[in-house]
Amino acid sequence: MVDLFNYRRRQSSPVKVGSIQIGGDSPIRVQSMTTTNTNDTEACVAQAERIIKAGGELVRLTTQGRREAENLKNINAGLRADGYLTPLVADVHFNANVADVAALYAEKVRINPGNYVDPARVFKKIEYTDEEYAEELKKLEDRFVPFLNICREHHTAVRIGVNHGSLSDRIMSRYGDTPEGIVESCMEFLRICKKEQFDNVVISIKASNTVIMVRTVRLLVSEMDKADMHYPLHLGVTEAGEGEDGRIKSAVGIGALLADGIGDTIRVSLSEEPEAEIPVAKHLVDYITKREGHLLVPATESAEFDWLRPERRKTRAAGGIGGSNVPVVIASYGKDENAADVEFSPDTTPDYIYCGASLPADRREGQKYIVDFNAYKGEPDTYPIFPYNATPFIGSVKADVKFLVLQLGAPSEEYLACLKAHPEVVVVAVSNQQNRLGEQRALTHELWTNGLFNPVVFAQMYRHSAAEKADFQLEAAADMGALMIDGLTDGIWLMNDGDITVRDIADTSFAILQAARLRTSKTEYISCPGCGRTLYDLRSTIAKIKAATAHMKGLKIGIMGCIVNGPGEMADADYGYVGAGPGKISLYKQKTCIEKAIPESEAVEHLLRFIEEDRKKK
């Protein structure tokens, strides 16, 4: 059972994967996947060693055919000859026979329930009687059990890896595109593992949508608990993208689950060199696990909160904050920043700027400001903020919106009475404790339990230099992940004691909100990291598409290396670019293919032309 307010890792069963253990009392493992051709032994060994030297503890390789699966033997030998004992994981799709071969040479084999026995997804609705559905499950078991026996004989671990983008038509026909269907896709295989007493299993459920990813993993954990299953979990946001956005998106999803103690191994999927994923994963793990042994957070969960199916907490809007409004962004000028010199991007300008004890001399027209309550003089578009010990003064100050800084442990009777009497007050929830998520959740649940509808803005303070901006972004995204997905967030206020600019901080705030599907400020790219199946230059293609579409705010564009998740993830994108074979690309509008197998040299131009023409019709 997850404790919302106190960090502790979920107890999972240990799984031996070659030279390491996943789950049990082992540390959270970090891993990556090669992008080289699995038939190219030398290239695979070289790239795997770069991953290992960066700190990777497992290396996954695509094995799309028998030839690739058999070459794992040579790759393994090459690594061992160089003194590396790091386990190799075979990634198998569409061909159960390949999984049988891979189990002979890899320390772990990943299979995808969406295409292990079921045919490739074509988005076809299939009507099954209960008897027919049971027959399909029997086919699955008849094929899966011999594979488990091979793995048992060769001490090979198994990952049952569900992807939202590659659910089978069978599952989709019976359950729809729902968290329940995604979880059932995994549970079908786990029930067979339990029946066969095969315990060397790791599981994963991934999606490019962080909300779906977090909610389905939570539901999976709940269903496993009911079935007395304790398999370790592999976490990841698939097709997260690259650069800052890819890191932020991964941190929102992975961080939300790690913060609840869920996760035994992680992979941060970036459309970059695979070794670049490892420092990101390690920082996330280190940042979250430092909470172990924190001071107890005494709190009671609101009876209205549902961790498995959270809905936004009901609040009464104060100005444009809370209610049905999108979460706001508050920012603060740095101590060495001159307000007149700061230029925000039009799409990421903060809704409110905190100025301390004095307003800037050159105020921006239409910009809202926050000042300390004892410096507030009722200026237009200006609002007072009160520390928790100044609640007696709130009633004497006239303003449409007032901000009150609160931390768990403040005299509750005093501030609860104040909030009840003043619906115009927005709570700014802060914490300086090791487990800030637990404290901020606890404070919000206390308001909820007491029937208060004041909006809540979560304020997070960090200490990073400009050179450490990436760490700041990861930590902020991880801290906000669960708060946003829980439906508790009416606003975000990131602060930093360092030289990261207020513009960068504002950009990060908006990126975090977009990663959680709460507020859109730019084009979103759902791009895979690539693997041995990718037969075109993924990174240069992403750069070309971004350069031509970055101004299309609100658009979601999928850029996929191959068909494994490509068509499925297109359902979450407006347009898509999917590898279809050597030098060939297929283009999609959502999940409908609009052009097949066009030459790679023409594909970006075709995509951009189609987007422009389609947008003109709207």
PLM segments and residue spans:
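A structural motif
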Residues: K53-L58, A106, F198, I262-G263, ...
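Catalytic alpha/beta core domains of metabolic enzymes, predominantly
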Residues: E127-F144, N149, I171-I321, K398-F403, ...
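Short, acidic/polar
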Residues: T38-R50, F94-A99, S250-I254, E337-S345, ...
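Active-site beta->alpha loop and helix N-cap motifs at the rims of alpha/beta catalytic domains
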Residues: D3, G56-E188, G319, A331-G438
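Conserved, mostly hydrophobic/aromatic
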Residues: V30, D91, I160, I203, ...
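N-terminal amphipathic alpha-helix/helix-capping segment at the start of soluble metabolic enzymes
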Residues: M1-S32, L148-H154, K290-N338, A547
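Glycine-rich phosphate-binding active-site loops on the catalytic face of alpha/beta enzymes
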Residues: E57-R60, A106-V122, A259-E275, G487-V502, ...
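Beta-strand/loop-dominated core regions that host nucleotide or nucleotide-derived cofactor-binding catalytic loops
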Residues: P582-I585, T592-K616
